[in-house]
Structure formats: C-alpha cells, structure tokens
C-alpha cells in the first residue's frame, strides 16, 4: 500500500510483518528495499571490488548461494524472482558502464554521475542476477529468428584491451543462438 513498515533482520533473513488482512495465494506484490553496506564475504563469489589495468572494476558472481551477500533476495535456487529491476549509480569519470540482466531501460546523466536502470522481465533464479561495472568497449548486434523473424538484441561488453582477441569469438553468438533455437525452440 506504499507505506513504510518495520522489519527484523537476523542472520540471513529479513522478516517483514504481514498486513492484518489475509493475502490470497498467488497474489502479486512488490517490496522496495533500500540496501547499503559492505557486502558479506562469500569466497570466490559474491560482490567483488577489483581492478583491471589500474581502473576500478566491480562484478558479481552469485552461484549458487551468494546472491544474498550483495542484495536482499530469497536466495534459493529452486525459486525464481518474477522480475528484477537493477538501478545502479556510478561516477561519470572514468566513463563507467553498467552491464546487467535484461534490457537497459534508461541511462540518466546527473551532474558527475550516471544512473543505469536494467530490468529483467522474465522469471530468474536469484543467483543469475548479476552486474558488472567498468569502462567497457560495447558493441551491438541482432539475432533474427529464421522461423519467426523475431529479433533479439545482442550486446557485448568487453575490456577494451581484450577487444581484438575476443571479437571473432563473439561473432559466433548468432550461430550459437540459431543452434539453441533449433534444439530448444
């Protein structure tokens, strides 16, 4: 109902009191959680602050139980989030680019910051939600289904120093999508 409520955070659980009415099974609702802090250490996975060629690099790897180390979620691989919005603010200098799941909804420049809004509209298990931040080289392509003529945007994000070595490999993406489309529909 758009109201701020209380919560209890113990261990890896956030408990939000239910309203005083019965919520029917299958009822869809959303919760907006403002989250900040230092991500919990999760071994080789989780939320990572790194450098590449002396430039800051942020990335995530959440498989299989490390999503909760960097964002509030039901971290259970057998369950899926209906959809996910990822909104990230980064400095404009260097020219950081945020890559994430789904489709980029917007990128807004505000002073010396950029705000990226990505949205995944399909059910996704929480450990597959990811983000990567770096001044990447980005290029775009498009897959066109031979069966339906449906199109799908393809976006490639790569470290600039690895572009030449990786470009020819990324050109295989459309052939791979064709194969997977033939095999799985």
Model-derived features with residue positions:
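Short secondary-structure boundary micro-motifs
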Residues: 53-55, 70-73, 153-154
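A surface-exposed beta-strand-loop module
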Residues: 1-52
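Generic recognition of long tandem-repeat/solenoid scaffolds
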Residues: 14-19, 55-60, 115-120
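Hydrophobic helix-coil surface modules that form long, contiguous segments used
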Residues: 62-63, 74-185
């Amino acid at each position: 109902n758009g109201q701020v409520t209380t919560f209890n955070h113990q261990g890896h659980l956030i408990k939000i009191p239910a309203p005083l009415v019965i919520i029917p099974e299958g009822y869809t609702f959303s919760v907006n959680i403002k989250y900040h802090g230092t991500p919990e250490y999760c071994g080789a996975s989780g939320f990572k602050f790194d450098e590449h060629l002396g430039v800051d690099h942020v990335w995530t790897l959440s498989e299989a139980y490390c999503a909760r180390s960097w964002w509030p979620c039901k971290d259970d691989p057998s369950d899926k989030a209906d959809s996910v919005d990822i909104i990230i603010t980064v400095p404009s200098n260097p020219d950081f680019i945020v890559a994430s799941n789904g489709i980029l909804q917007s990128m807004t420049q505000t002073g010396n910051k950029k705000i990226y809004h990505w949205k995944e509209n399909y059910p996704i298990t929480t450990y597959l939600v990811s983000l990567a931040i770096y001044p990447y080289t980005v290029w775009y392509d498009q897959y066109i289904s031979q069966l339906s003529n449906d199109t799908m945007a393809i976006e490639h994000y790569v470290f600039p120093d690895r572009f030449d070595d990786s470009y020819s490999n990324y050109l295989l993406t459309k052939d791979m999508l064709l194969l997977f489309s033939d095999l799985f529909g």
